[in-house]
Amino acid sequence: MTLRWYGSKFDTVTLKQIRQIPGVKGVITTLYDTQPGEVWTREAIRALKEEVEAAGLHIAGIESVNVHDAIKTGAPDRDYYIDNYIQCLENLGEEGIKLVCYNFMPVFDWTRTELARELEDGSTALAYTQDAVDALDPEKMFESIAGDMNGTV
């Protein structure tokens, strides 16, 4: 079993805490201090791997190598960013990471209308309601997202 880990700079849950959960052997993570379109170096990938492995876990996959908007929109400079994306995937593979979750969502990357909807068993989950999004003014939507991040990136 794996858990999502937002990195030592951004996650309030440490790898040591994750390691204490019975059955958890790895994490799904990413390089949060890189910009879309930037090539991930093997050194940066290796440093992330070493940090996770030092805690007794492994990187089960990456979510995600963010796709530059030039690729999503077919802009004239898209080929440059496609080449960078390919290099990122090659570097990940060379460092032994074989799973990448792809994210091609435009503009807001991902959007949820609730970050902690309570479920019947008392646990919480992310939720998305299209009617709530349709009723939002785009500027108010951005303000809501920016102001309600609850510690997430």
What are these regions (language model features)?
Residues V24-I28, L48-E51, Y81-D83, G122-T124:
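Short, surface-exposed linear patches
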Residues L3-V13, L31-A44, D79, V107-W110:
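Acidic-and-aromatic substrate-binding clefts and catalytic sites of carbohydrate-active enzymes
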